[in-house]
Amino acid sequence: AGKYFEATDKNFQTEILDSDKAVLVDFWASWCGPCMMLGPVIEQLADDYEGKAIIAKLNVDENPNIAGQYGIRSIPTMLIIKGGKVVDQMVGALPKNMIAKKIDEHIG
C-alpha cells in the first residue's frame, strides 16, 4: 500500500522541491477538524498515485518555517509542487475526485 510522505522543515528541500515527480503537500494540524476529515482521503490518494506522484503531509505546528514560507493562512491547504515551484493550490477538505483531477493535470 502507498504511504503518504511526512514532510518537515528539514526534508522539504530534498524530498519535495528537488523531486522529479509532482508532489501534493497537505498542510494540516491535529486540532483542525477539516484536516482530520481530509486525512483518509490523503491516504487513499497515496495509494492511488504510488509511483506516479508523491503525496505528502506537513504538520504546520511542527514545521512553521515551511508553512510560513508558503504563506499558509488557513488549513487544510494543499499545494501541488512540480520542479520546485507551486503549480496549484487548493483550500479546504475537498472531495477526493477534485484533488485527483488537479494532480492528474500535473503528472505525465
From Swiss-Prot:
Keyword field contains NADP = no
Occurrences of domain Thioredoxin (ranges): 2-108
**Top-level lineage group:** Bacteria
User: What GO MF annotations does this protein's record show?
Assistant: protein-disulfide reductase activity
In terms of Pfam families, this protein maps to: Thioredoxin (PF00085)
What Gene Ontology terms describe where this protein resides (cellular component)? cytosol
The similarity annotation says: Belongs to the thioredoxin family.
Q: What does this protein do?
A: Participates in various redox reactions through the reversible oxidation of its active center dithiol to a disulfide and catalyzes dithiol-disulfide exchange reactions.
- The protein depicted here goes by the name Thioredoxin
Native species of this protein? Answer: Chlorobaculum thiosulfatiphilum
Cite the source lineage: Bacteria, Pseudomonadati, Chlorobiota, Chlorobiia, Chlorobiales
Gene from which the chain derives = trxA
